[in-house]
Amino acid sequence: GVIILGIVWGLWHIPDDLVCYTQTSGIQMIFAQQITCISLGIFFAYAYMKTQNIWVPVCLHYLNNNLIPIISGTFSADVLENQTVSWKDLPVALVLNGLCFGFFLLADVFKKKEVQEEE
């Protein structure tokens, strides 16, 4: 379910990918966004399931969206616009995101709970 959530979330970002983030490498950006959204979806779901507090993933999402402008000191959309993503960047993004976030899928909160039948 978490993977499907990440895919849907990535699809929801397609207009931003094509209009705001890049106008030269749209298809690559869509694939990169899918990798990012699936990875962050796993982590955000873990954070929610661990805390049972919707504000935790909301705050994490806010930090994710705003850390680059804060760290760069460029408080403008320019820091996020006109990105270039090449096909060779995608395997690197997949491996790095997989290493950073994939192991959360092994957490107890994602394990299927057995339902005991009443006799």
Model-derived features with residue positions:
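Membrane-interface interhelical connector segments
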Residues: 17-27
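Alpha-helical transmembrane segments of multipass membrane proteins
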Residues: 12-16, 40, 44, 68, ...
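Membrane-water interface at transmembrane helix exits
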Residues: 12, 16, 48-52, 108
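Membrane-interface helix/loop boundary segments of multi-pass membrane proteins
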Residues: 1-8, 20-21, 46-53
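Functionally important transmembrane alpha-helices
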Residues: 27-87
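Residue-level recognition of pore/gate-forming positions within transmembrane alpha-helices
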Residues: 6-10, 62-65
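C-terminal membrane module of polytopic membrane proteins
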Residues: 62-119
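Small-residue packing motifs within transmembrane alpha-helices
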Residues: 2, 6, 33, 37, ...
